[in-house]
Amino acid sequence: MGEGEEGDKFPPKTDEVTQESMKSARQLDFTGGSSDVEHSHSNQASSMAAASIPSPIVTVTRPIITSQAPPTVATPIPPPPQSQGIILHVPIRHPRPESPNSMPRPAGETRDGTPQKKKQCNCKHSRCLKLYCECFASGTYCDGCNCVNCFNNVENEPARRQAVESTLERNPNAFRPKIAASPHGGRDNREEVGDVVMLARHNKGCHCKKSGCLKKYCECFQANILCSENCKCLDCKNFEGSEVRQSLFHGEHSHNLAYLQHANAAITGAIGSSGFASAPPPKRRKGQEIFFNQGTKDSSTHRLGQANNGRTTSSQTGSRAGGNASLGPSKVVYKSLLANIIKPMDVKALCSVLVAVAGEAAKTLTEKRLANQKETSVASSVQDQGHVNNKAEKSGLEDSNADGSKGRSLSPETLALMCDERDTMLMVAASPNCSVEPTSQLPNGQDQVYAEQEKVVLTKFRDCLNRIISCGEVKESNCSMSRMDLDTPVQTTVRIDPVVQQAPVANGVSQTAKQPSQLNTTTPNTSSQTANGVSQTAKQPSQLTTTTTTPNTSSQTHLHKTPALSEKKDL
């Protein structure tokens, strides 16, 4: 009976616990398990499958409840923290896409030419909400920067959003990247390092002055693009066809640069420095062009009332023109005067010519050697015959044994020595410049053929260089003449034609007078005035001393009566 009573006590406990467990399951399904309910409705399960679903739940809960009754209260506790965590993360994720860059770049992302490390700002008074803050301008939050009182973070998102909106109202392109249409492919994917896609261009331009736009702090060079019209750099070398830029990207930078500098210095010293004048003319802005055009129009339409100030105004207009030319962003680009003269084909032809000349020199030298050897052989044969004759004479002297008044007979040893000395003297006299040995060498250990070839090649190369220098001088003179032609219109003075002024009518006759011109003239100007019907001419003093004077009357008047005078006579 005890076992039956115990068995009777267990079922109601299990029912109560199953109800609590079902309530907790419903709560879980209500909060986060709605997707499971929708999934069960969409599958259209049968009534038998629906009845089989609660049975495993009861079977699973029974051993857990029978083994440990107290922990049943703690089982529904773990799910609520997960739901709370999900709710807390939702408001943090929403505002991020509303930043200027919807896809923020990671700190260590590598872009074309940009450094791997993220730049850190050092703002102190702007709260990192101005465009000169690099983090704010790039649309990223400050992370590990050295800024003070920073508002460019998640905690101050409302203030940051307000600053972004106000900035966009003032300038819609404020958060646009500096380099438009830049290629995002890596440098390794390109054919050669330094080959630039021409679509990329800097929107604002660089302001380099001393680096030649070939350093990392030049934004155009850093992004691997060429400098454009927007740039305001000086002495730029980051343009298409720049030899310095090509040598920088194609290895052996220091050696190639040194060779180029030495070559340019030599060409400049031999020809001239007009290679710097081959740069395009300076560009003016629209406002400056309008101002310059107005100045020229004002000078061309000068009135006679301002004739006394003609010289000052013309000088002012000339100074304005010069000022406008200097204010424009002038790029002094060095281009060698021999850039379009010397070509690779010419260099190859020169090398072939030098090789041919060296071969001809060796051939002529061998021919000379053979001729010299023949001459030496003929001379040696003549010397042998002379030696035989000398021996015969000596033998005759020995046979005679006659002592002269001033001399006496010599011994045979002395005669032999004297004959050897004569033979050596004759040999040296026969070949003073040419050696008898076929393989003669110079004191430096070089063959005479090599020395002759070197001499001929150097002389030929010198003649070629002289021709190139003459061509460069001709081109330099043409460049200087063209530059003078460009400068002459600015220096020309404006010619002011004299304007005849109409004087008031006196006694029915118009009086005209010509004012003296401010320009250099050789003839004086005279004016005529008519008073009471008589024309009067008066000479104006000339500004320059002249030998001959020719009076020029400005006007001729004819006498005629006016209706006013006729009416008076009738009255």
Curated annotation (Swiss-Prot):
Compositional bias (Polar residues): 293-319, 373-388, 508-539
Coiled coil: none
Lineage top rank: taxon: Eukaryota
Compositionally biased intervals (Low complexity): 540-557
GO CC annotations, alphabetized: nucleus
PROSITE patterns attached to this UniProt entry: CRC (PS51634)
Compositional bias ranges of the Basic and acidic residues kind: 7-16
Pfam families: TCR (PF03638)
One Gene Ontology molecular-function label: DNA-binding transcription factor activity
Subcellular location: Nucleus
Function, as annotated: Plays a role in development of both male and female reproductive tissues.
Homology family: Belongs to the lin-54 family.
Free-text note regarding domains: The cysteine-rich domain CRC binds zinc in vitro.
Name of protein: Protein tesmin/TSO1-like CXC 6
The species this protein was found in: Arabidopsis thaliana (Mouse-ear cress)
